[in-house]
């Protein structure tokens, strides 16, 4: 049993009715299970959430607590991100698949750089000032395979601009799925008269993860409810349709789990708060690291109480809605080294640098925000058709997918959604457990 996992970045519960009205995502909901109340993690940032999507763990276990490394001395736009798979401290679907002898592919999936578990790897990495985007991606990914794709589809891409980048990514994914069986290359000029099903599909990866960013880009640039965001969602539906068509054309739909998920929503930005500058100006022994619509406070343990008092005394002045204490952060299973965090009033974005560019919308809010309710479609022979799941957690997705395709994630903090699985694939579960 194969797995195709597609992430629709920055779509959320409020988008459900519109997305279900579109031809491909609507049809996919009819083929299997749909849920519009998938509780995401804290923080609501792309890299931590996408790591949870493939580990079933919270940041306190998988180790990815932010998109960027904490580098306060370096200006925004020049900081390193968590691009490398070695940053992840727990097993992923990719590592467990490799233990079970399966192949994986990842296309623009966060935190996959230099992964030894992914055979076909086009990682999401961003060129910093002075770097070349293509050369950097080749260094972090499967270079020769990426070069072949660039020769085939490079004309479709305009750097990292959307929607062309998503179009390129979907073409690469569909090409992987549609790779033709070529018996003459393996068995001689007369070919293999009766190839096995596995031989027929030997080039299609067992796990394929695809990250589509069009809607996230549109919302950051134009706003949460912009026409451009609505148009991006229509394009996302077309991309999902491309993948479904490739699976149907390969006659692999009935032997594949197709999962479409999201990571977080967004909310419009109405103003900014330079919290780190305020801390420095007022000699508060802490440094802020923006999450967007929230921030971490990096402090020494001995400074916890004075920093907490300084924040409480200035909540109204700073337009802070909520201060997350260390107890609340431990309950949310946020990174263990974060002892304090804040969430400002609705629409206030915390900035690390007063000169940085401010988007029209962003995320990074707490788990009680409406944008923290995400979406999930699950289709495959083990999932009942036309079924609504009332709610689940985003950390439940990876162990459920692993179980459905005969793998396991014994370190996952989420649970297997057994109530929506009829017959899981047993083939490699025991082998993976023993690996």
Question: Where are each of the predicted segments found?
Answer:
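Anion (oxyanion) recognition and catalysis
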Residues: 29, 98-99, 252
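Short, structured active-site-proximal loop/turn typified by the sulfatase FGly-forming signature C/S-X-P-X-R
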Residues: 16-61, 105
